């Protein structure tokens, strides 16, 4: 059963992924993303290093470590100068939890289905911050594995991203449009996620690969929304102009399907 976080009637739905055709690899083998490295080297590096080692030895430790991250490493923004709330680029505890997800992938080894189920359980049992951490962890897995996460992880990740996109919490929605979403959400779901950010007033800097995935349909949606706002005497966000200039056709096709 896929979790839900709000009753947003316009929310996109998840797309069913094709089953994996290749055995899973250990996604943590490649260098982790910059934010994860920064978290691991921060002032609380000792606790985080011990926690990650514990998770690598016993994946069940993630159930305890993930909720503790905020209290142990802090909840400040990763980029306080440009993102003081930590909504767009995430927080220190987001990065620490992403590192926990990488450690969890190592602990599960080639058991891709076990990893996928564990990530789903952590997300479903978690509060908003922990759910963000799982989503940021999916981004870390997407960046760390040369061929991306294994099939079962992608399938579950799509479900979790779709759930987050039904939420009204801006930080959760922003965490669901990172590199994992850029690589694996279908175009219909991805477009609606981008437009939802505009509705919420969240900078589109949160969206990974925006220029690569923007297309004529997204530009049309943005123009229509801008027209509606002008007719209602409401301000038009600058990001709508940014979307209105999208390319006439998708420049890349990364997800398995186009429209549901």
Please place each PLM-identified region on the residue numbering.
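Eukaryote-skewed repeat-based solenoidal scaffolds used as protein-protein interaction platforms
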Residues: 96, 101-232
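N-terminal alpha-helical scaffold/docking segments in eukaryotic complex subunits
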Residues: 1-109, 188-260
């Amino acid at each position: 059963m896929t979790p839900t976080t709000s009753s947003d009637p316009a929310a996109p739905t998840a797309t069913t992924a094709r089953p994996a055709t290749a055995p899973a690899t250990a996604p943590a083998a490649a260098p982790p993303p910059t934010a994860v490295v920064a978290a691991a080297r921060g002032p609380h590096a000792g606790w985080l290093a011990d926690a990650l080692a514990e998770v690598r030895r016993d994946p069940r430790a993630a159930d305890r470590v993930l909720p503790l991250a905020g209290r142990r490493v802090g909840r400040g923004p990763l980029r306080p100068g440009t993102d003081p709330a930590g909504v767009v680029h995430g927080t220190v505890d987001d990065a620490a939890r992403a590192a926990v997800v990488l450690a969890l992938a190592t602990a599960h080894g080639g058991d891709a289905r076990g990893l996928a189920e564990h990530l789903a359980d952590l997300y479903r049992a978690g509060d908003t911050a922990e759910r963000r951490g799982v989503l940021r962890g999916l981004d870390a897995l997407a960046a760390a594995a040369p061929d991306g996460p294994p099939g079962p992880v992608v399938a579950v990740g799509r479900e979790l991203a779709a759930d987050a996109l039904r939420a009204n919490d801006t930080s959760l929605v922003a965490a669901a449009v990172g590199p994992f979403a850029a690589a694996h959400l279908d175009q219909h779901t991805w477009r609606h996620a981008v437009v939802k950010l505009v509705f919420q007033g969240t900078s589109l800097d949160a969206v990974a690969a925006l220029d690569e995935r923007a297309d004529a349909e997204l530009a049309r949606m943005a123009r229509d929304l801008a027209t509606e706002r002008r007719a209602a005497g409401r301000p038009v966000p600058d990001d709508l102009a940014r979307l209105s200039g999208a390319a006439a056709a998708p420049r890349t096709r990364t997800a398995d399907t186009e429209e549901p």
